[in-house]
């Protein structure tokens, strides 16, 4: 199954972007190849840019406080697994404490490193990171892989508390919805949202369905158009009916 997610607020959009960047950074940093570490460093710069949003830190702290209050009220509920609940509450406390102790904006440790900022400046220029542009970077790429991995991990470590908070909030958000089986006649699906106020819409398709959903939504209406996918496929709406799962997620 393939999940397609559509955020309905800038806050959730930012969290999804960060989640994607964190996963991409890990994938590149775990490699031993120099070019993978080049990609990891570029991803690190993106992480810092997205995480530097002025209200991100305060938003996450407030959301963690809110979720802790909601979940704490479930203690003693016979329908809730107490061990799982306590694990989530402990994770919320750890992420909250870690974020609260972060000085200034997330990613400031990168901005204060002159070497990294010189690399970042050249990275903004197409083809601007050749060895004659940045000989010190060329030297770094030729250091032992273990040394580069250690430095990448050190540069990524200050994002740990933000990453944990993002994972908790998105995990709770995704778990808040119940999938509904739906059908898009001739590739189109439309639905009034009525009293729903989703923060995230998830569309789930079977792997073999050669279509992707194009989603548009506001607080009143949801429209999904399934279009042909694949490299070289003619762009257009599917003519057949599409079976899919639809999930509305709200915290």
From Swiss-Prot:
GO biological process per UniProt: division septum assembly; FtsZ-dependent cytokinesis
Key word Cytoplasm present: yes
Record's keyword terms, sorted: Cell cycle, Cell division, Cytoplasm, Septation
Source domain of life: Bacteria
Subcellular location: Cytoplasm
Metal-binding is among the record's keywords: no
Coiled-coil region list: none
Gene Ontology CC terms: cell division site; cytoplasm
Pfam families: ZapD
Primary location group: cytoplasm
Matching HAMAP family: ZapD (MF_01092)
NCBIfam families: PRK05287.1-4
Entry similarity comment: Belongs to the ZapD family.
Function: Cell division factor that enhances FtsZ-ring assembly. Directly interacts with FtsZ and promotes bundling of FtsZ protofilaments, with a reduction in FtsZ GTPase activity.
Quaternary data: Interacts with FtsZ.
PANTHER family: CELL DIVISION PROTEIN ZAPD
Name of the protein in its database record: Cell division protein ZapD
Gene source species: Thiobacillus denitrificans (strain ATCC 25259 / T1)
Gene this chain is encoded by: zapD
């Amino acid at each position: 199954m393939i999940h397609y997610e559509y955020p309905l607020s800038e806050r959730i959009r930012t969290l999804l972007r960060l989640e994607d960047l964190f996963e991409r950074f890990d994938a590149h940093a775990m490699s031993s190849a120099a070019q993978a570490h080049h990609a990891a460093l570029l991803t690190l710069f993106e992480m810092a840019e997205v995480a530097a949003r002025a209200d991100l830190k305060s938003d996450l702290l407030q959301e963690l406080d809110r979720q802790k209050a909601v979940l704490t009220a479930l203690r003693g509920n016979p329908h809730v697994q107490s061990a799982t609940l306590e694990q989530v509450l402990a994770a919320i406390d750890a992420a909250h404490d870690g974020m609260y102790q972060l000085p200034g904006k997330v990613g400031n440790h990168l901005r204060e490193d002159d070497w990294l900022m010189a690399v970042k400046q050249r990275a903004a220029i197409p083809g601007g990171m050749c060895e004659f542009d940045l000989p010190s970077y060329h030297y770094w790429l030729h250091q032992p892989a273990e040394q580069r991995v250690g430095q990448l991990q050190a540069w990524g470590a200050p994002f740990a508390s933000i990453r944990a908070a993002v994972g908790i909030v998105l995990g709770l958000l995704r778990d808040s919805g119940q999938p509904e089986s739906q059908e898009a006649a001739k590739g189109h699906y439309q639905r009034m949202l009525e009293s729903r106020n989703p923060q995230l819409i998830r569309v789930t398709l079977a792997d073999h369905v050669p279509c992707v959903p194009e989603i548009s939504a506001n607080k009143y209406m949801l429209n999904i158009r399934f279009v042909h996918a694949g490299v070289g496929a003619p762009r257009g709406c599917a003519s057949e009916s599409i079976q899919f799962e639809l999930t509305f997620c709200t915290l």
